[in-house]
């Protein structure tokens, strides 16, 4: 996995009437002071600095310096803040991917869905999520799924949904495009860009300072450099690995995955990019025995072993899709194995990044819904770079949803931000030979 969500970050041209903002320095950022009050914000600048402080928390913990805050739009009351938590530190030193979906915005939406009734929180339309960087496809789709307003500080011209700074969201299909236009706003910057987008966001009539904008960029780029230097090597090629399914020494690896998925390593296909009927039957059975589930996703390692699979839990949490749970399960189990001195060596001899494996959907995502686009974005966040090999695809499915055609599913990919369309080259493919 190439975990860098926004390695090629630059600040795009400003919105209409604004000035271009140059790329931020990758030197040492100035210390980010703690807000005087993290319980309430009183304007756009204090909201932006709260998000910046949250981003710094992510960087300080060894992950990316991107963060967000969830506030009541009318009052400025802060409900929650979340930094990026994709990476965690290891007991032996260095960092490792723990959850490829743990971007701040996605975590905020999962928290809101889990706490809304218990805490009596206001409706999504009365809330604003402010984020230090334009949301990636996964996070934007999570925000659209819930229906909150979104205030953005800095543009991301590589993976952000407003990557071209036009505010048209032409990279998204309808009805997502119209929904983004109605809920996403980009704060004006003193001496720089004009406001762009929806006026429904908190403090839409107030600008932020260029210093805060610059600090958001510097915090991210510096943290990305630190992640690259601190992360433990994780992308071993299959030729250098030992098949855990046939290696008696890998029993602890197998048992770790069987805790949540008892069938782990009991199915092995001849070619890892050619799922067979047994994989289909396993996913169908998983849905059948999971109350309320309608979909399941499995992960095949480069040796063809069905390592893990998950059914969706969307009745519990809309963002608990089968893919999100599956990719999270693989990453977190792998992290735990690498983080233990007893299993570190065998884990590194047996497991590698998902780019070398295959994700198999029982039913492909519906790209015309925010939930479906969430899965496509989460796949991109998981991979971070091209699959190896690229053909056959590492993104496969047995069935299509409703009236969606294979052509429509692929056509949605082409306009997506460069990370997804040019780098990863996401290419959903129907499983061959299984009816």
Where are the predicted features?
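Zinc-dependent deaminase catalytic domain
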Residues: 9-13, 17-20, 30-435
């Amino acid at each position: 996995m190439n975990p860098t969500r926004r390695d090629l970050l630059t600040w795009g041209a400003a919105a209409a009437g604004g000035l271009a903002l140059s790329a931020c320095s990758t030197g040492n950022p100035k210390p980010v002071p703690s807000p005087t009050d993290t319980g309430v914000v009183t304007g756009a600048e204090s909201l932006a600095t709260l998000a910046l402080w949250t981003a710094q928390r992510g960087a300080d913990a060894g992950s990316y310096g991107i963060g967000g805050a969830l506030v009541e739009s009318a009052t400025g009351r802060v409900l929650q803040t979340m930094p990026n938590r994709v990476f965690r530190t290891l007991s032996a030193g260095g960092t490792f991917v723990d959850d490829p979906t743990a971007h701040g915005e996605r975590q905020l939406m999962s928290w809101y869905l889990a706490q809304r009734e218990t805490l009596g929180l206001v409706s999504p339309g009365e809330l604003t999520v402010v984020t230090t960087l334009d949301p990636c496809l996964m996070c934007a789709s999570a925000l659209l799924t819930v229906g909150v307003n979104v205030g953005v500080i800095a543009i991301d011209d590589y993976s952000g949904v407003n990557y071209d700074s036009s505010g048209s969201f032409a990279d998204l299909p309808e009805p997502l495009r119209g929904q983004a236009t109605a809920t996403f706003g980009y704060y004006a910057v003193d001496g720089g860009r004009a406001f762009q987008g929806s006026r429904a966001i908190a403090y839409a009539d107030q600008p932020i300072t260029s210093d805060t904008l610059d600090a958001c960029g510097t915090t991210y780029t510096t943290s990305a450099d630190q992640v690259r230097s601190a992360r433990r090597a994780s992308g071993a090629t299959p030729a250098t690995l030992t098949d855990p399914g046939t290696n008696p020494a890998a029993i602890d690896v197998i048992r770790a995955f069987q805790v949540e998925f008892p069938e782990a390593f009991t199915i092995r296909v001849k070619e890892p990019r050619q799922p067979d009927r047994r994989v289909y039957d396993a996913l169908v059975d998983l849905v059948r025995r999971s109350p309320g589930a309608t979909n399941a996703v499995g992960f095949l390692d480069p040796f063809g072993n069905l390592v893990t699979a998950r059914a969706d839990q969307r009745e519990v949490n809309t963002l608990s899709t089968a893919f999100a749970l599956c990719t999270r399960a693989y990453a977190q189990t792998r992290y735990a194995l690498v983080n233990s001195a007893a299993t570190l060596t065998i884990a590194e001899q047996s497991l590698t990044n998902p780019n070398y494996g295959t994700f198999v959907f029982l039913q492909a995502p519906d790209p015309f819904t925010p939930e479906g686009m969430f899965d496509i974005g989460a796949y991109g966040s998981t991979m971070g770079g091209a699959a190896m090999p690229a053909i056959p695809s590492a993104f496969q499915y047995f069935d299509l949803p409703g009236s969606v055609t294979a052509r429509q599913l692929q056509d949605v990919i082409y306009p997506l931000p460069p990370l997804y369309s040019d780098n990863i080259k996401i290419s959903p493919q129907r499983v061959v030979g299984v009816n």
